[in-house]
């Protein structure tokens, strides 16, 4: 799709909607999993855990606007682990680097007020990096991304392992992928039903109409019903922003490919 087509599609009304939506820091995914009960269910589903007390989960997501470019959707500590969850509708080869920058700030925050020059070891939770991918570009069911893939040389330890490594597990949650995960976490399954509903209507309708129609259909069918009834206006505005951003990202990639970049 050319830039001209995208601009024509946007229009003044779309620009106004986009401006409104940009005021929200949340994403639909983050809104859903701001509920500790739902977040614990997702954690148990993806990790194989069997935790039962949502209050044992401590949400530690960084909120500072300056870190929005490297943000993750939700970070939380449970037992001895720090989990960083991110939902992505586009493929990001730099996710390990983004997570490195983010977790460094997270560790700095967790260690605040403690003497890092002390002979006593400062204990830190073991980090886990999970990306939930639901974009249109074909991806495998599971993909491990490594920070070392970005290294220009192999200047590593004697055993051949990098001196600094970070692994991100990307889980494809599109229809037909990781169905067992979604079976164990009904909210994740219904989230993808909503996303697919918007995409289906978006093919034949203006984006706002597609989102509003999808919201009403999901409410009728009991898909995220309570959440959509409670957060309807915010979900509509946020969805417009998210799907506009998804279109923008795809357009930039297509134009780069056409230009031979």
Role assignments for model-derived ranges:
Residues 1-261:
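Elongated, amphipathic alpha-helical interaction scaffolds
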């Amino acid at each position: 799709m050319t830039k001209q087509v995208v601009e024509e599609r946007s229009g003044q009304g779309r620009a106004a909607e986009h401006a409104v939506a940009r005021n929200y820091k949340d994403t639909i995914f983050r809104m859903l999993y701001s509920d500790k009960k739902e977040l614990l269910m997702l954690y148990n589903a993806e990790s194989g855990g069997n935790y039962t007390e949502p209050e044992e989960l401590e949400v530690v997501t960084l909120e500072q606007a300056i870190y929005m470019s490297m943000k993750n959707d939700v970070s939380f500590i449970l037992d001895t682990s720090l989990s960083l969850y991110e939902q992505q509708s586009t493929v990001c080869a730099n996710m390990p680097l983004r997570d490195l920058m983010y977790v460094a700030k997270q560790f700095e925050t967790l260690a605040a007020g403690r003497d890092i020059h002390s002979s006593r070891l400062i204990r830190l939770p073991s980090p886990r990096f999970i990306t939930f991918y639901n974009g249109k570009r074909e991806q495998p069911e599971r993909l491990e991304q490594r920070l070392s893939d970005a290294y220009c040389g192999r200047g590593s330890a004697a055993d051949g392992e990098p001196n600094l490594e970070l692994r991100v597990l990307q889980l494809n949650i599109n229809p037909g992928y990781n169905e067992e995960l979604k079976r164990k976490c009904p909210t994740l399954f219904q989230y993808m039903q909503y996303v697919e509903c918007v995409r289906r209507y978006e093919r034949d309708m203006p984006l706002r109409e597609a989102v509003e129609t999808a919201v009403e259909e999901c409410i009728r069918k009991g898909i995220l019903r309570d959440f959509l009834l409670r957060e309807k206006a915010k979900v509509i505005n946020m969805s417009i922003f998210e799907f506009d951003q998804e279109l923008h990202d795809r357009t930039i990639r297509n134009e780069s490919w056409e230009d031979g970049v």
